[in-house]
Amino acid sequence: MREETVSWKYFKRDVVPFTAMIAIECTTVGSSILYKAATLRGFSFYVFVFYAYVGATLVLLLLSLIFGRSRSLPTAKSSLFFKIFLLALLGLTSRVAGCKGIEYSSPTLSSAISNLTPAFTFILAIFFRMEQVMLRSSATQAKIIGTIVSISGALVIVLYKGPKLLVAASFTSFESSWIIGGLLLGLQFLLLSVWFILQTHIMEIYPEEIAVVFCYNLCATLISGTVCLLVEKDLNSWQLKPGFSLASVIYSGLFDTSLGSVIHTWGLHVKGPVYISLFKPLSIAIAVAMAAIFLGDTLHLGSVIGSVILSFGFYTVIWGKAREDSTKTVSDSEQSLLLPSHDREED
């Protein structure tokens, strides 16, 4: 009985989060692949973003009714609702930049550039004075070096293609604009880093994962719907035809935007941000395989070299963050041990 209890705890603590994080990376890449396939057939990315948010909002509404707690949602006049609205505006802008970036380049480039997120977050944390820069600290040195290496790797991917390593059967004559796509994807993950900082602040004052994600998607739906009405005046572009267009919207709304966000937030609570981040470079390999199979993308030497450099910088930043967190934990525990003895001396 005791062995079964230990096995169940191990399964729940380690196996479930591990499997969930791999599934999330596959889901994210799969959404990018389907979206790319849909846009190659003329599907408007504004319409895609709007319908994806609509689908996510409906799914999260159902989840909030089933699993939601009795705590009331923030009112439209509250400062919390304004922050969630700002979060939606940031998320929507980031997503539009990302969709356009994938349209100009490829899902593989998107997966590679996504590894810049920790470096961007570190830079923004310094800018907003949320991060203390101690140049003599090994943790700070690792984060600085990792940030520089990550950005260098991203530049290699964007600016240098090199010879072809894997030539797949191309299903389209679409000519990509690699540099423009790389810049847009860089903007996407820069905005996403700001999004993470604001989301962390919101979760501290309102720790309701499903409610926050639901309100976020609802606001994003309203904003994207307004933008879509202004940009896409041809009503025919709003039609969801059977095929990649419909599949990309359903897949993104059901799995990526809604359930993916909830599982990602759950993973942050269960295992922490460092553990979640360790799986990001895995998306590069997944994207290379899926893009070659389903889109006929060609793999270049520059993408491989840049991805290796970027992944090294990524893990260096993560190591520095983990080192900093462990140092803080040891320091706090030492202080908690010293305080009682100090009190006894005064008595």
Swiss-Prot record:
The protein's name: WAT1-related protein At4g15540
- What molecular functions are annotated in GO for this chain? transmembrane transporter activity
| Domain of life where this protein originates | Eukaryota
Pfam families assigned: EamA
Instruction: Report the membrane topology from the UniProt record.
Output: Multi-pass membrane protein
**Cross-referenced InterPro entries, in alphabetical order?**
EamA_dom (IPR000620), WAT1-related (IPR030184)
Localization annotation: Membrane
What family is this protein classified in? Belongs to the drug/metabolite transporter (DMT) superfamily. Plant drug/metabolite exporter (P-DME) (TC 2.A.7.4) family.
What lineage is on file?
A: Eukaryota, Viridiplantae, Streptophyta, Embryophyta, Tracheophyta
Q: Which residues cross the membrane?
A: 15-35, 47-67, 73-93, 108-128, 139-159, 178-198, 210-230, 243-263, 276-296, 299-319
Its Gene Ontology cellular component terms are: membrane
Give start and end of each EamA domain: 30-158, 216-317
Entry keyword set: Membrane, Repeat, Transmembrane, Transmembrane helix
